[in-house]
Amino acid sequence: MAQTDSTLLDAEFLAQHTSGLEEFDGWVHGLGWSEIEETSGLPRSDLESVARIYATAKRVIGVYGMGLTQHVHGAKSIGMLINLLLMRGNLGRPGAGICPVRGHSNVQGQRTVGISEKPELVPLDTLARQFGFEPPRDTGMTTIEVVQGLLDGRVKAFLSLGGNFARAIPDQGRADPVWSGLALNVQIATRLNRSHTLVGDGAWLLPCLVRGEEDHQSGGPQAVTIEDSLSHIHGSIGRRPPAADTLLSELAIIAGIAKAALPPNPAVHWDKWVGDYGLVRDLIADTYPELFTGFNDRMFQPGGFYKGNPVRDRVWKTTSGKAGFTTPASLSALDNVPGSGVCSLITLRSNDQFNTTTYGFRDRLRGLEGNRNIVLMAPAGIAAAGLRAGQKVALRSTHADGYTRRLGGLTLTPYDLPDGCVGAYYPEANVLVPLGLHDLDSKTPAYKGSPVRVVPDPN
């Protein structure tokens, strides 16, 4: 469309605010429609219909989630979505932009205050000045690297702030046996889960307060903060009585461990910080003054306070000072295009599921109910494979790394999926996701696109 109507592109925005368009344009024009249709699973007519909608929309927000990120080329997929927004100037103006969907109340907020495996993203010099110590500057571990470290014995201790790590990770079948060999496994949690049972002798389960429970410390009732998906930071006060008088807050547990494990430091006041969380927020404001000045005063303003986003003001934090177009090496987000008889596995969550926790067995979003031990497949694909709806089948990984991965006892269920794709529920299907399949940039596990075969299950 842009070939025939130059007004579809925001030429002024592209010239002033972007770089790399020429390279990306050359890559796009090197593609053929047959390749695009085969890779996407969509006909040209459908793609052009969607393109017309986008081209005529005055304001567009690109919303994405794990369907884009959890691929071998997931980061490049997000880059392609940003490319689409850049072409019509849909960044940095009202009613437009890009919005990742995040479920947990602080999955973004913890990054904002420097929790990262990448030392270059943490203000280490500031922390050294504040607290009179030399912080470690070694690169930490991603999820993939932690699991690999468990398998090869490099990881000796594990401390989890909530979550169900052992069920959320890929390659559970390989990882499950090694948990019992850890010298130390500390789980700080609000409810029991499977990870708490895969332990050895040096294991501690420390229950803590949930955010909705009253948190009384020596300084009185305490509040915490969360950051939402749109970068607004809100205060939160628990209103329910704690489940037990003996419960400690996460902050109290972490500070208690640190106080017992580390030598005294006159610049570090663990007990005071536990007694008054406002003092911790003051330290955050001192560490990030451009974001958190007046933190305690602003946290309860209606709607929360806006953290800010340079892109909103068309300020690009890149080496070129401009927004860069992404030119991928491959059209497909997959590691390899599946061969004959091989399907790409999509791990799914039901609408009554939050992360690894399943609250019910009615997946109303997909019109499914009951057993979660199912595999979804297009009716035409079922027929082509010589299978039948309702048949018991198994999924068998075809990833060639020397390990056997199989999930059986699944009911074959017809569903409107693209040809060559099958769907199964997360985390049950994580046993089929190889540890070696992950995004090449972020190392996010490839919970989408793992290669599998659907075979009859005689058992």
Where are these regions (language model features)?
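Long, low-complexity segments enriched in small/aliphatic residues
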Residues: 272-364
